[in-house]
Amino acid sequence: MATAGMNDVKNGMKILVNNEPAVISETEFIKPGKGQAFTRVRYRFIKSGRTVEMTMKATDDVEVADVVDTNMDYMYSDGEYWHFMDPETFEQVQADKAGMGGAEKWLKGEESCIVTLFNGSPIFVQPPNFVELKITETDPGVRGDTSGGGGKPATLETGAVVRVPLFVNQDEIIKVDTRSGEYSSRVK
């Protein structure tokens, strides 16, 4: 494995911490008036999303992770694994439930996703920012029923449940923001 000195560490760099890949979100070089210089590093574990802050000496080294973000097309799910294909090389990989990271509720087929590969296997899947999905079940909106905040739950074709405005009906196609899980607009 490759290592990098603390002078080479930058935001966005992917490192290994206890054999788990992490991405550096913030670095701060500190040179006190007395004593040895050090670097304060904040990083986020890719699999769990947990953020940790660590102080390292200027002479310390970090292990660089073999992590690659690749654009891949979602093909299908066989119930246990979700299958993705690289559109350029036609190489296929399969992600388990832990590797999907909750993205499975937004994918219906043939969406382009960013798949994070660690040592050749997927550890995180980022769905497109917006997806268009059909509403399979929702209560009809009753005129004048705005006392509950003006929204109602709707089940989408992938099984995800989002809050939609009262005017949206069953069998309509809506646009959903996958980052927040919120309704964005109706698709004409």
Curated annotation (Swiss-Prot):
InterPro entries: Elong-fact-P_C, NA-bd_OB-fold, Rib_uL2_dom2, Transl_elong_fac_P/YeiP, Transl_elong_KOW-like, Transl_elong_P/YeiP_cen, Transl_elong_P/YeiP_CS, Transl_elongation_fac_P. Its main location: cytoplasm. One of its GO terms (molecular function) is translation elongation factor activity. The keyword Metal-binding does not apply. May be beta-lysylated on the epsilon-amino group of Lys-34 by the combined action of EpmA and EpmB, and then hydroxylated on the C5 position of the same residue by EpmC (if this protein is present). Lysylation is critical for the stimulatory effect of EF-P on peptide-bond formation. The lysylation moiety may extend toward the peptidyltransferase center and stabilize the terminal 3-CCA end of the tRNA. Hydroxylation of the C5 position on Lys-34 may allow additional potential stabilizing hydrogen-bond interactions with the P-tRNA. Belongs to the elongation factor P family. This is Elongation factor P. The gene is efp.
